[in-house]
Amino acid sequence: MQRSDPPRPLLEMRGISKTFPAVRALAGVSLTVHPGEVHSLMGENGAGKSTLMKILSGAYQADPGGEILIDGRPISIDGPLAAREAGVAVIYQELCLAPNLSVAENIHVGRELRRGNGRRGTIDRAAMARGCQDVLERLGADFGPNTLVGTLSIAEQQLVEIARAVHTRARILVMDEPTTPLSSRETDNLFRLIRQLRAEGLAIIYISHRMAEIYELSDRVSVLRDGAYVGTLERDALSAERLVGMMVGRDISGFYKKAHAPYDPGNLLLSVRDIADGARVRGCSLDLHAGEVLGIAGLVGAGRTELARLIFGAEPRVRGEVTLAGKAFAAHSPREAIDAGLVYLTEDRKRQGLFLDMSVRENINISVCGRDARLGALDLARGAQRARDAIAALSIRVPHANVNVGALSGGNQQKVLLSRLLETKPRVLILDEPTRGVDIGAKSEIYRIINELARAGVGVIVISSELPEIIGVADRVLVMREGRIAGELGGRTDAPITQEAIIALATGSRTEASAAH
């Protein structure tokens, strides 16, 4: 029996290079994508993924020597309009929509329908609404074409972007980290839509750092590293170890490996009893032991972050008791908590954690600069050495300590923030979504740091929406639902820590009693 020939590629990018002043972002990268395929693109931050896609979208011009082919024909993409005419649409992490315009107006932007005399005619909003109604229905939208975009949720706005791509008859759809702002239910809906578009013959280039998404969606995965093409894996050949090794250029066996000794249940470090804020947290209790990594899981809105901020003292509590190292603890501010040895890494590093217009050195030292004061002046040399030591210890990729934090990748920003917290010598460290938006290499570094802290006797609480992460790093897992602790997995219970058990507790289909037996 003869095997059928594979379909002709819809997109071929051959030998694509891009040089910026003093930096070569891409070096002869090639990528082939077929119709009806979800082709994932992976690599660490700075690997060249975004640059390659910006060349495809017309935002950047490639260096001479490479070529782009669609349906086997070379084309020139010299700007976003040329990309759109070639059938390319890109949905970025930051959605490109006008919130004060309707859904129909956003879908038709740059292609407005007019009455009368060409471009001088008045915009025909009714015709635009009629023209995109069928696309919205086809994609399962539960809002109409005249809905104001600013009133929609992030997931619904993302659907508007997809509708715009479909309406322009895009054949190649690029999606850059599309699930970052979405809940698990919204993510499931997005995946359903992606499969629908794939079945209709679209070629989808999917960029993500999340392994579970890559496994679930991908037909093939291509990996970039340091601006160069490393290779492409078929779906059947995918494994976390192989992908990570391709991305970082070295073997990372046991990606989530617990490399610390079992904690001592008799060495209680933090005790929380019946803590509540009167709204999102409704009476939670937990224990954390020295050398333990405690995971907190739950759906978006379950109250995980609010619980962490209550313990830390960033929000007032209406009731409850907290004991730290055997002493009553009632921080009225984050400063008091830090001085007592309890620190919190926020889930929103850019708005609540980092000073983006300040240097790496300043960000690392800002929580402990009082130690360096001599006769009212800061010891800058001591602060500079502290920053250099932190950069080396956490493998922060930065040319020097005086570069602004805002110029760094997400993973390096996270490590700067983490290094600042570690300079306070904490006894308890609460990490809220510690690997959100960071690449695989940075994730492995953060997991290494968590293990080192646990080995040193620090109690670590990890809040994460990535279930493989929670399962991989935590000794025990508490699952929250609607502001309460719904159940405990692992530890002294008989309930194993599994994705199914976490989801069951988080959604209410499993009770605390059934989780423990």
UniProtKB/Swiss-Prot annotation:
GO terms for molecular function: ABC-type D-ribose transporter activity; ATP binding; ATP hydrolysis activity. The complex is composed of an ATP-binding protein (RbsA), two transmembrane proteins (RbsC) and a solute-binding protein (RbsB). The keyword Cell membrane applies. CDD domains: ABC_Carb_Monos_I, ABC_Carb_Monos_II. It catalyses: D-ribose(out) + ATP + H2O = D-ribose(in) + ADP + phosphate + H(+). This is Ribose import ATP-binding protein RbsA 2. It is an enzyme of class 7 (translocase). It comes from the Bacteria. Keywords: ATP-binding, Cell inner membrane, Cell membrane, Membrane, Nucleotide-binding, Repeat, Sugar transport, Translocase, Transport. PANTHER family: CARBOHYDRATE TRANSPORT ATP-BINDING PROTEIN MG119-RELATED, D-ALLOSE IMPORT ATP-BINDING PROTEIN ALSA-RELATED. It is a peripheral membrane protein. ATP binds at residues 43-50. It comes from Burkholderia pseudomallei (strain 1710b). Gene3D superfamilies: P-loop containing nucleotide triphosphate hydrolases. Residues 11-251, 263-507 form the ABC transporter domain. Its EC number is 7.5.2.7. It is found in: Cell inner membrane. Belongs to the ABC transporter superfamily. Ribose importer (TC 3.A.1.2.1) family. Part of the ABC transporter complex RbsABC involved in ribose import. Responsible for energy coupling to the transport system. GO terms for cellular component: plasma membrane.
